[in-house]
Amino acid sequence: MRAARLMGALLALAGLLQLALSLRIAAFNIRTFGETKMSNATLSNYIVRILSRYDIALIQEVRDSHLTAVGKLLNELNQDDPNNYHHVVSEPLGRSTYKERYLFVFRPDQVSVLDSYLYDDGCEPCGNDTFNREPSVVKFSSPSTQVKEFAIVPLHAAPSDAAAEIDSLYDVYLNVRQKWDLEDIMLMGDFNAGCSYVTTSHWSSIRLRESPPFQWLIPDTADTTVSSTHCAYDRIVVAGPLLQRAVVPDSAAPFDFQAAFGLSEQTALAISDHYPVEVTLKRA
């Protein structure tokens, strides 16, 4: 019995060591993330617990015109150490008065931001732009991982245009490659890539799915939703040989925070109707 307990403790320690020697990245659509949600102590506590799992986290559906909620989030993430997390946030994006931001929070002792830009998807007032919320792309330096530099392309796709927007991520990928002479690119977010928004018949016309450079890490069979639906809306796609080799096998998955924290469905849905999707990169 004592030997079995010792073996269990050693395995647990090995798991913690492996986690410490890796870089964990996530995309999380926090439904209607703003002042109301961050003013709720229970919800904000769970959000901070979830985000604290990650070295880089992309947050979507940020509805925070004055960045008050973002400031509260950073204060709570940095409660013990003011340098735990830094952030990069986009301008408000959207074709109508409804706007959202993309927000990246990251650990500066693990990665640093080398550059960022808002992808130019055409003339919005003219009605010929491609995305409802065009990607705000960030290039990271990661000295301690096998891949030293990589870009993250975020997308919260409009449900009614999901297939077309996912296809157009191929053009964003080409633009990032040309702009930064960089092959290692991660595309992630709430693509609405499942159920009625993207069906089996759509996939053959989506270049991001059909082209050889891309590996889709979250499968069509995954469930990234909190409610009783079973939809693989949230995805992580990687391109580039170094980045693809750096992915820890089988590390990409939704994080079911409802089960992890023992929450009721009501409480879980108050946090978000999506689970984060996450992936781990190997250390050098």
From Swiss-Prot:
SMART domains from the UniProt entry: DNaseIc
Gene Ontology cellular component annotations, sorted alphabetically: extracellular region; nuclear envelope; nucleus; zymogen granule
Cofactor: Ca(2+); Mg(2+)
Disulfide bonds: 123-126, 195-231
UniProt enzyme class: hydrolase
Principal location listed in the UniProt entry: secreted
EC code(s) of this entry: 3.1.21.1
Listed GO biological process terms: apoptotic process; DNA catabolic process; neutrophil activation involved in immune response; regulation of acute inflammatory response; regulation of neutrophil mediated cytotoxicity
Free-text cofactor note: Divalent metal cations. Prefers Ca(2+) or Mg(2+).
The keyword rRNA-binding belongs to this UniProt entry's keyword annotation: no
Keywords, alphabetical: Actin-binding, Apoptosis, Calcium, Cytoplasmic vesicle, Disulfide bond, Endonuclease, Glycoprotein, Hydrolase, Nuclease, Nucleus, Secreted, Signal
MF terms (GO), sorted A to Z: actin binding; deoxyribonuclease I activity; DNA binding
Family recorded in the similarity comment: Belongs to the DNase I family.
Protein's name in the database: Deoxyribonuclease-1
Encoding gene, per UniProt annotation: DNASE1
